[in-house]
């Protein structure tokens, strides 16, 4: 059976009733049932749930149930974090405010309790109890009162802060509230001095920040890449740093500084100068507390630079005070050790160099600072000139002047100035470090002046240290600063630099120095000798070095002239390589970016799926825990009710008194009932035994009492009977007298009323008459009104029923019309679907047919290409063999590139003249290639329209060149023909190249062809788009090498240049008969106007054009004989050539 649940508003009323009767636990259970019931979670708005939530949290605070408050807050967040964030914020702030108020009230109560105890007895302030308690626990009354009264509320408030932070850490809408609660938690730790809770709070916030940086941006997730989030985190860490410094938790302060630096590095926006100044100030304080004087001075120097550069209203006094602070902190840095490698023998997690590098990163420095570098930076910034005269003298005495006898006296005056000046309170911590640096300077300067010195004399010079401190500094200087010092306690003397053979490293003095140590002089003797000898050689031979430099310069110039062209080409080539490399890298970057984008998208998808799975698992886990908690709560409730029920009985109280709280919690209701029954049985047995033991006593005692009572009872009854008789007689007499008096009064009253009978009868008659007429009149009016209302209602019912019948008829007509329209629409939709399906099947059949035709044509094309390649290879081999035979005969009458023979030496025919120059052939070949490319483009367009022709215009250049080099061009004419040619013929003596490509006739023919091509352009592009799209959708193949499909079958031709393929886009051109007729007419016109070439023995027409028709006359016999001889000499080369 399902559990009965109340509506939220009813639950709130019920909870208020429980509170009024003093049952807050029942009220809290009632409200908790509402939040546990998912039926009401999302059915009501925040206006209904928010008052209930406030009451729920109020009860949790009153009863100190922080875990129950956490459960309710999480449920409320899930309901309203995406709907109304302000409501969630108000609820959380109200909860924390109530917890803080109760904690403050507990603190005031604790203080008041201690005050009452203290003022209880002024004569006995120290009571024996207080003395014993202080001896046992070591606490005073305030501590004990706080532990009993204040500490539970402090713990509750701390748990409340932690729960709210955990609640809001992943909600981007509540970022400001999250950081406000973090600051409130810091204030809580400061107010109640909770250092351990402060450390846990810092760890919790650091863990939350790491989770934000790792997690992806969800729907309500917090993204660290947003500027607002970064600024809020930065402000919170700065507040954390201030709180840690106030509580003197320097380790937490250092971790906060690391977090702040990481956030500033992560932010794309530069932090404001005020934030940076606060950061450097706190960092310098942390370094000072850690005893790291070097980085403390570096942080102060960064703060001084930032303030000097960015603060506009900086006064001279402030600048002087900051400069003095920086200068004194820098001078107080201990002198660096000459043995930094000693630290690597110390077992630690990180080496000192790594630690120093990490600290330098916090200051924004590229490398760790040193004392020398900081002093150099201080001098560069002109800090010594900004301070007062005393501090300027301090710098000069420590870092510039060499005066060991007066050094300590001078420094002592500065120390006195710092200690006596109230404005120098910030500089007091540097006094001891300054004294140590001064003593070390003194020892170093004394070692450069004296070889030995008395201990007492050195103590006089070091005025502000005793003998033990001085000896310790001497030992430390030997250990860390690589100084040769020997103390002779017998003679009470100190010896410096006695071992002249020991000097492990180069000595670089830090600060003022008079001379180097003797061991250093001996170690660098060879270096000094080399320097002196080099200087002497330059003085003895002053021109040698100049001549060497001039010779070296000439060699460099000559070498430059030798390699400049090569280097120039190399640089240009390198530039080209760089450009290619850039293009390659750009392509790689683009590909990588695309791959990265795909990978990120995939990772984002996987992360979303994982997050969704995690949320589902968490939801299941929460449901499981909630179910377990409900079962446990039911058990506890039943146990509590059972215990309460048992405690109401005497034997139950007795049984419970034998058990403690832990024992009761371990038992369940059945075990308690069992113990109760056992207790009842035991008590019953005890009672039965007692009764049996007392039965005899009671029996005899009762019998004795009754025997003694008999005479007394008889006397009492006799006296009582006499008294009762007297009382009855007196009472009866009084009753009779009263009855007689009442009778007399009633008779007198009746006599007085008899005279009013006639008046009564008259009044009744008049009243009856008057009311009868009024009744009749009202009855008539009522019947008339009733009849009128009946008629009106009948008329209204007739009209209403008539209107209802009309509306029903219209509704039926409308439904019939809609039904018919729906049937027509469904029929039309079915017809359209059938037509679409038919069109789709038709398109698929057409595509399949075209695909099969394409595959068939493609096989034909591959076969034709293979045959063309074989013919080309065969012809190239034949041409090569023919070329070898002709080179043996050495055609002397027609040398290539030389002077052409005159007409008198040989009147060869027009087609036997030498081939054009290579450049002319190449030009014409290039022209063919260009026109071939145009044909390829047009052919590609026809292929997209579904054509199946293939145009190989790209091969025209190769075939033309092969034809130009073929054997017929270099064969000799027979001597008989040369002799038979008349020398006085009308043929021109110079060469006529009109038959060649590019002549006048061919030019007209090409112009006409080009004009036709231009006319065909628009017709080719007229219907190209849709078919191209359809072919692209079908995945139509398009060749990229220039060849394309044609509608005509492939001709098997030879490898000669005359076999170049023709244009395949003829479907849009003029018919072939009309084009041939135009060409013949053009030729006829040209023959009529051209000079007669037949007399010279040449061919009359241009052989490159279309062949002669049937109507033309046969060629002359001499031409036929010449043709036979050429064919015989070509070795069958022209037999396979088909006429166009």
Swiss-Prot record:
An example molecular function term from Gene Ontology annotations: translation initiation factor activity
- Give the gene symbol: eIF3a
Q: In what residue span(s) does the PCI domain sit?
A: 319-501
Q: For this UniProt entry, which residues form the secretion signal?
A: none
User: Per the annotation, which location comes first and is thus the protein's main one?
Assistant: cytoplasm
Print the keywords alphabetically: Cytoplasm, Initiation factor, Phosphoprotein, Protein biosynthesis, RNA-binding
Oligomeric state and partners?
Component of the eukaryotic translation initiation factor 3 (eIF-3) complex. The eIF-3 complex interacts with pix.
Q: Name one Pfam family in it.
A: eIF3a_PCI_TPR-like
* Gene Ontology cellular-component terms listed: cytosol; eukaryotic 43S preinitiation complex; eukaryotic 48S preinitiation complex; eukaryotic translation initiation factor 3 complex; eukaryotic translation initiation factor 3 complex, eIF3e; eukaryotic translation initiation factor 3 complex, eIF3m; multi-eIF complex
Q: Where does it localize?
A: Cytoplasm
Q: What job does this protein perform?
A: RNA-binding component of the eukaryotic translation initiation factor 3 (eIF-3) complex, which is involved in protein synthesis of a specialized repertoire of mRNAs and, together with other initiation factors, stimulates binding of mRNA and methionyl-tRNAi to the 40S ribosome. The eIF-3 complex specifically targets and initiates translation of a subset of mRNAs involved in cell proliferation.
Species of provenance: Drosophila melanogaster (Fruit fly)
| InterPro entries linked to this entry | EIF3A, eIF3a_PCI_TPR-like, PCI_dom
The annotated region (Disordered) lies at 588-630, 829-1140
Compositionally biased spans, kind Basic and acidic residues: 588-623, 829-899, 920-976, 990-1051, 1059-1086, 1109-1130
Q: What is this protein called?
A: Eukaryotic translation initiation factor 3 subunit A
GO biological process assignments: formation of cytoplasmic translation initiation complex; regulation of translational initiation; translation reinitiation; translational initiation
Q: Which family does it belong to?
A: Belongs to the eIF-3 subunit A family.
Where Phosphoserine occurs, the residues are 908
């Amino acid at each position: 059976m399902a559990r009965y649940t109340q509506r939220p508003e009813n639950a709130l009323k019920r909870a208020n009733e429980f509170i009024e009767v003093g049952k807050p636990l029942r009220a809290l259970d009632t409200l908790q049932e509402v939040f546990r019931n998912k039926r009401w979670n999302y059915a009501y708005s925040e206006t209904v749930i928010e008052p209930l939530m406030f009451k729920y949290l109020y009860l949790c605070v009153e009863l100190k149930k922080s875990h129950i408050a956490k459960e309710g807050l999480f449920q409320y967040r899930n309901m309203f974090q995406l709907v109304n964030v302000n409501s969630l914020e108000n609820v959380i702030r109200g909860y924390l405010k109530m917890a803080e108020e109760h904690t403050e009230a507990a603190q005031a109560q604790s203080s008041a309790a201690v005050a009452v105890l203290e003022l209880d007895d002024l004569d006995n302030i120290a009571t024996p109890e207080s003395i014993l308690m202080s001896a046992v626990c070591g606490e005073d009354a305030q501590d004990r009162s706080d532990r009993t009264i204040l500490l539970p509320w402090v713990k509750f408030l701390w748990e409340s802060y932690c729960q709210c932070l955990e609640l809001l850490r992943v909600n981007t809408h509540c970022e400001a509230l999250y950081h406000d609660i973090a600051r409130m938690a810091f204030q809580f730790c400061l107010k109640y001095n909770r250092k351990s809770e402060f450390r846990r709070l810092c760890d919790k916030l650091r863990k939350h920040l790491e989770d934000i940086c790792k997690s992806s941006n969800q729907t309500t997730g917090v993204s660290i890449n947003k500027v607002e989030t970064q600024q809020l985190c930065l402000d919170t860490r700065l507040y954390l740093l201030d709180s840690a410094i106030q509580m003197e938790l320097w380790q937490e302060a250092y971790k906060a500084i690391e977090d702040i630096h990481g956030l500033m590095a992560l932010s794309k926006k530069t932090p404001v100068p005020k934030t940076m100044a606060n950061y450097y100030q706190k960092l310098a304080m942390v370094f000072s507390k850690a005893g790291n004087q070097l980085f403390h001075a570096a942080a102060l120097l960064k703060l001084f630079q930032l303030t000097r550069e960015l603060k506009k209203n900086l006064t001279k006094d402030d600048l002087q005070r900051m400069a003095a602070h920086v200068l004194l902190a820098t001078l107080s840095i201990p002198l660096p050790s000459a043995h930094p490698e000693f630290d690597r023998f110390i077992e630690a997690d990180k080496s000192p160099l790594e630690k120093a590098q990490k600290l330098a990163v916090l200051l924004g420095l590229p490398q760790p600072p040193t004392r020398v570098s900081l002093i150099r930076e201080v001098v560069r910034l002109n800090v010594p000139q900004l301070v007062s005269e005393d501090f300027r003298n301090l710098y000069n005495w420590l870092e510039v002047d060499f005066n060991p006898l007066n050094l300590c006296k001078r420094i002592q005056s500065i120390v006195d100035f710092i200690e006596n000046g109230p404005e120098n309170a910030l500089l007091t911590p540097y006094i001891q470090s300054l004294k140590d640096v001064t003593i070390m300077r003194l020892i170093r300067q004394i070692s450069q002046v004296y070889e030995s010195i008395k201990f007492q004399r050195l103590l006089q010079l070091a005025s502000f240290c005793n003998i033990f401190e001085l000896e310790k500094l001497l030992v430390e200087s030997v250990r860390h600063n690589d100084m040769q010092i020997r103390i002779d306690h017998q003679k009470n003397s100190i010896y410096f630099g006695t071992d002249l053979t020991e000097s492990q490293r180069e000595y670089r003095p830090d600060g003022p120095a008079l001379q180097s140590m003797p061991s250093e002089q001996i170690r660098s003797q060879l270096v000094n000798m080399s320097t002196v000898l080099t200087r002497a050689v330059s003085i003895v031979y002053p021109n040698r070095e100049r001549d060497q430099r001039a010779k070296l310069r000439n060699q460099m110039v000559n070498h430059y002239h030798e390699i400049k062209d090569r280097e120039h080409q190399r640089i240009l080539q390198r530039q080209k390589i760089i450009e290619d490399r850039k293009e390659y890298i750009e392509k790689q970057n683009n590909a990588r970016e695309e791959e990265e984008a795909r990978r990120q998208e995939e990772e984002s998808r996987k992360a979303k799926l994982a997050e969704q799975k995690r949320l589902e698992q968490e939801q299941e886990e929460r449901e499981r825990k909630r179910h377990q908690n409900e079962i446990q709560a039911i058990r506890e409730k039943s146990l509590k009710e059972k215990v309460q029920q048992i405690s109401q009985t005497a034997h139950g109280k007795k049984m419970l008194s034998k058990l403690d709280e832990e024992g009761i919690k371990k038992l369940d209701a059945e075990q308690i009932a069992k113990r109760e029954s056992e207790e009842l049985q035991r008590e019953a047995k005890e009672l039965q035994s007692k009764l049996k033991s007392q039965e005899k006593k009671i029996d005899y005692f009762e019998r004795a009492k009754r025997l003694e009572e008999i005479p007394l009872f008889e006397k009492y009854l006799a006296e009582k009977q006499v008294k009762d008789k007297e009382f009855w007689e007196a009472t009866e007499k009084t009753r009779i007298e009263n009855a007689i008096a009442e009778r007399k009064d009633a008779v007198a009253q009746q006599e007085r009323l008899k005279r009013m009978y006639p008046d009564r009868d008259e009044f009744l008659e008049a009243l009856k008459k008057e009311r009868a007429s009024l009744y009749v009149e009202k009855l008539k009016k009522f019947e008339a009104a009733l009849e009128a209302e009946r008629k009106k209602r009948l008329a209204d019912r007739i009209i209403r029923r008539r209107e209802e019948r009309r509306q029903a008829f219209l509704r039926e007509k409308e439904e019939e019309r809609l039904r018919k329209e729906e049937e027509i629409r469904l029929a039309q939709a079915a017809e359209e679907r059938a037509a679409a399906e038919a069109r789709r099947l038709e398109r698929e059949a057409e595509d399949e047919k075209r695909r099969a035709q394409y595959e068939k044509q493609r096989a034909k094309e591959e076969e034709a290409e293979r045959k063309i390649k074989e013919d080309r290879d065969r012809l190239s081999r034949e041409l090569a063999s023919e070329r070898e035979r002709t080179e043996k005969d050495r055609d002397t009458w027609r040398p290539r590139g030389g002077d052409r023979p005159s007409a008198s030496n040989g009147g060869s025919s027009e087609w036997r003249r030498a081939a054009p120059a290579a450049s002319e052939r190449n030009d014409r070949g290039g022209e063919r290639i260009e026109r071939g490319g145009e044909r390829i483009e047009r052919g590609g367009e026809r292929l997209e329209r579904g054509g199946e022709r293939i145009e190989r215009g790209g091969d025209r250049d190769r075939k033309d060149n092969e034809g130009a080099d073929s054997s017929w061009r270099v064969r000799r004419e027979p001597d008989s023909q040369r002799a038979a040619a008349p020398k006085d013929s009308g043929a021109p003596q110079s060469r006529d190249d009109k038959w060649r490509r590019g002549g006048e006739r061919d030019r007209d023919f090409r112009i006409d062809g080009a004009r036709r091509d231009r006319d065909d352009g628009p017709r080719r592009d007229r219907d190209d788009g849709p078919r191209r799209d359809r072919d692209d959708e079908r995945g139509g193949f398009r060749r990229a090498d220039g060849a394309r499909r044609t509608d005509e079958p492939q001709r098997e031709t030879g490898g000669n240049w005359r076999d170049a393929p023709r244009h395949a886009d003829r479907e849009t051109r003029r018919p072939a008969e009309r084009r041939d007729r135009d060409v013949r007419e053009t030729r006829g016109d040209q023959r009529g106007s051209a000079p007669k070439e037949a007399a010279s023995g040449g061919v009359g027409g241009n052989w490159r054009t279309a062949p002669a028709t049937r109507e033309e006359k046969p060629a002359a016999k001499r031409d036929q004989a010449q043709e036979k001889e050429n064919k015989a000499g070509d070795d069958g080369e022209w037999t396979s050539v088909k006429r166009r």
